[in-house]
A protein has these predicted regions:
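Glycine-rich N-terminal segment of FAD-binding domains in flavoprotein oxidoreductases
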Residues: 8-105, 114-117
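N-terminal regions that are enriched for targeting/export leaders
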Residues: 1-6
């Protein structure tokens, strides 16, 4: 068990955690357990990233860039990649994210899950 919290730190709850190393592992854990949620940077407002009574799949190790088409500006990455890493990687290549939240310490998966800036 590990205590996890969200950005507001209003709740600090015990979770059964599993560290992910690939997507197949996540599918197996969800199929063989009760409800689960992916947890990365813990910057969600409210408690959207928490799952007391279920499992938390920590995806910070899923932090690889898979491809970049520099001509089209299309990047494929794993869900644990942070916006900080993306900015450090893309800006020297002449690319920027079209929108950014108030922090760079969020994961791509968290941005998608929370619909950050549409």
């Amino acid at each position: 068990m590990k205590k996890l919290s969200s950005w507001g730190n209003t709740s600090n709850l015990n979770h059964e955690t599993h560290t992910l190393f690939d997507a197949d592992q996540a599918q197996s854990l969800i199929a063989n357990n009760r409800n689960g949620i992916v947890y990365a940077m813990g910057r969600s407002y409210g408690d959207a990233c928490l799952n007391p009574g279920g499992i938390a799949l920590e995806n910070t190790n899923l932090d690889r860039l898979l491809s970049l088409d520099e001509e089209l500006g299309i990047l494929e990455c794993e869900s644990g990649v942070t916006l900080k890493f993306l900015q450090e990687f893309l800006i020297p290549k002449g690319w920027m994210l079209p929108v950014s939240p108030g922090t760079q310490y969020v994961s791509v998966g968290g941005c998608i899950a929370n619909d950050i800036h549409g």
